[in-house]
Amino acid sequence: MSTPYYPHPIIAREGWPFIAGAFAVALLVQFMAGWLWALPFWLIALFVLQFFRDPPRVVPALAGAVLAPADGRIVAVDKVQDPYLPREALKVSVFMNVFNVHSNRSPVDGEIRNRWYFPGNFLNASLPKASLENERNALWIRTDGGQDVTCVQIAGLIAKRIVCHVHPGEHLARGQRFGFIRFGSRVDVYLPLGTKVNVAIGDKVYATQTVLAEFH
């Protein structure tokens, strides 16, 4: 196992405006109406603070491993048509509820070959049709071993903002942070047929730490 340099604050930058706003409202209500009226606002502020936590993770030193791109629960393991590349693929979907860490991390080492953004709906991200109907951002990653992996950030019922910090031509390392989805969402990973999947529907997974699958 190896712990890479993690150049990110423990509270994600994507959340700083929301955190500042939540605490400012709580302070204002306490000043204007007292602590009893302010208590619900302080609880909301603390919830927002914990939502944007972004702890470093240990990267498994396992050759050929495909790592979980997000914390959450497995809601789909299917053989499907990849919506982004002309192929059949294995789809593994991770659903994040509002209590999970929402930082998104690369499942593999590889070069970003393309990136697509699609505006869309904000259906419950645990539903199968959310993969194709919700707002989403897709990355096509060509691994260092030549495998094609598609990693898709999908907005959810509450999530209204997908953040992706990387672009075609850049190289990602396994476990490298590449984006964030605010307030409930999902990440789909499309893998080549023949990849050994190590998870099942209902399993809890943790970004970078859980090995979703292995290339042969």
UniProtKB/Swiss-Prot annotation:
Q: Would you tell me the protein name for this molecule? A: Phosphatidylserine decarboxylase proenzyme
Q: Where in the cell is it found?
A: Cell membrane
| Enzyme Commission numbers on file | 4.1.1.65
Modification comment:
Is synthesized initially as an inactive proenzyme. Formation of the active enzyme involves a self-maturation process in which the active site pyruvoyl group is generated from an internal serine residue via an autocatalytic post-translational modification. Two non-identical subunits are generated from the proenzyme in this reaction, and the pyruvate is formed at the N-terminus of the alpha chain, which is derived from the carboxyl end of the proenzyme.
Reactions this protein catalyses? a 1,2-diacyl-sn-glycero-3-phospho-L-serine + H(+) = a 1,2-diacyl-sn-glycero-3-phosphoethanolamine + CO2
Which cofactors, if any, are listed as required? pyruvate
The protein's predominant localisation is: membrane
Q: What organism, scientifically named, is this protein from?
A: Nitrosomonas europaea (strain ATCC 19718 / CIP 103999 / KCTC 2705 / NBRC 14298)
Locate the Pyruvic acid (Ser) modifications and list their residues: 185
Catalytic residue positions = 185
Function field = Catalyzes the formation of phosphatidylethanolamine (PtdEtn) from phosphatidylserine (PtdSer).
The secretion signal range is none
Name the GO terms of the biological process aspect: phosphatidylethanolamine biosynthetic process
Please give an example of a GO cellular component term from this record.
plasma membrane
Q: State the pathway, as annotated in the record.
A: Phospholipid metabolism; phosphatidylethanolamine biosynthesis; phosphatidylethanolamine from CDP-diacylglycerol: step 2/2
The UniProt entry lists membrane topology as: Peripheral membrane protein
Q: List site positions: Cleavage (non-hydrolytic).
A: 184-185
> Which molecular function GO terms apply here?
phosphatidylserine decarboxylase activity
Keyword Electron transport among record annotations: no
Tell me the subunit arrangement: Heterodimer of a large membrane-associated beta subunit and a small pyruvoyl-containing alpha subunit.
Note the HAMAP family from the entry.
Answer: PS_decarb_PSD_A
Q: Which gene encodes it?
A: psd
**Cofactor descriptive note:** Binds 1 pyruvoyl group covalently per subunit.
